[in-house]
Amino acid sequence: MRQTFMANESNIERKWYVIDAEGQTLGRLSSEVASILRGKNKVTYTPHVDTGDYVIVINASKIEFTGNKETDKVYYRHSNHPGGIKSITAGELRRTNPERLIENSIKGMLPSTRLGEKQGKKLFVYGGAEHPHAAQQPENYELRG
């Protein structure tokens, strides 16, 4: 009798990947990173278990936008007080806080559940080319597109 393989915490191998965001389009990079964080690039993917790998994104400040998104795309947040809405364009956010731009994009593609939160904690984004995770011996990951 054959049994379907179901991954659990004891039989998951996690790797560390470094992805260079220089010259990459924001959405294409984000969708691929979200897929790696969820573990969908593995044959052992199981929907209810966190089978994903750790991802380090470097050069976040050199991400690219297509079209007029740099000036036309606006991010809003609200403080829940009357008149407390704040807005910032994508280009301005890239100049001031490029890490938050990529984190918000990727975490928006993960599930809004406890499992999605757990998967989102395996993402590390840095604006420059340096990162403090050399001890984990991360592998370079080439994007498909």
Swiss-Prot record:
Keywords: Ribonucleoprotein, Ribosomal protein. The keyword Ribonucleoprotein applies. It comes from the Bacteria. GO terms for molecular function: mRNA binding; structural constituent of ribosome. GO terms for biological process: negative regulation of translation; translation. Pfam families: Ribosomal_L13. GO terms for cellular component: cytosolic large ribosomal subunit; ribosome. SUPFAM superfamilies: Ribosomal protein L13 (SSF52161). Belongs to the universal ribosomal protein uL13 family. This protein is one of the early assembly proteins of the 50S ribosomal subunit, although it is not seen to bind rRNA by itself. It is important during the early stages of 50S assembly. Part of the 50S ribosomal subunit. HAMAP family: Ribosomal_uL13 (MF_01366). This is Large ribosomal subunit protein uL13. It comes from Staphylococcus aureus (strain NCTC 8325 / PS 47).
